[in-house]
Amino acid sequence: MTTELADAESRLSGVGLRVTAPRRAVIAAIGALEGPFTIEELTAAAPGVGRATVFRTVKLLQEAELVCRMVLEDGGVRYEASAGGHHHHLICSVCGGVTEFSDPALDLLIQENANLNGFQLAGHSLELYGRCAECTHRAG
């Protein structure tokens, strides 16, 4: 068992969730996929686990902060393992590449704005769209 798989199972157990065989299969499939994935790609990578079970498991993994959800510029949704904790995304509109970044000052600014407006923040997601350095260079 990989360290990441063991950590994911431990975190699920730690928040009171059972680690069933289908959940274990989904976690293993996430570990085998490279980069962001769709529910369909994850379902294909977890043979024998139904789409509804994959979807529910991904939702639980999001709540346990083990998976991060991204909304792409075209409205499509992709997910990724998020063992590194909370982060944001720069998404290239040309090649579809995703770059993760963390900025505690930005997170503090978001929290301060929520507080100023009397808003109790439960969480946030930030995706920035544009052109990556490589695509910008290729475009001249």
Regions from the PLM with identified roles:
Residues E41-A45:
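A short acidic, leucine-rich amphipathic alpha-helix
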Residues R24-A29:
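Pre-recognition alpha-helix immediately N-terminal to the DNA-recognition helix
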Residues A21, L33-T38:
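Short capping segments at the starts of secondary-structure elements
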Residues V54-E65:
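Basic amphipathic alpha-helical segments that dock to polyanions
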Residues T2-G16:
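Short, Lys/Arg-enriched N-terminal segment that forms or immediately precedes the first helix
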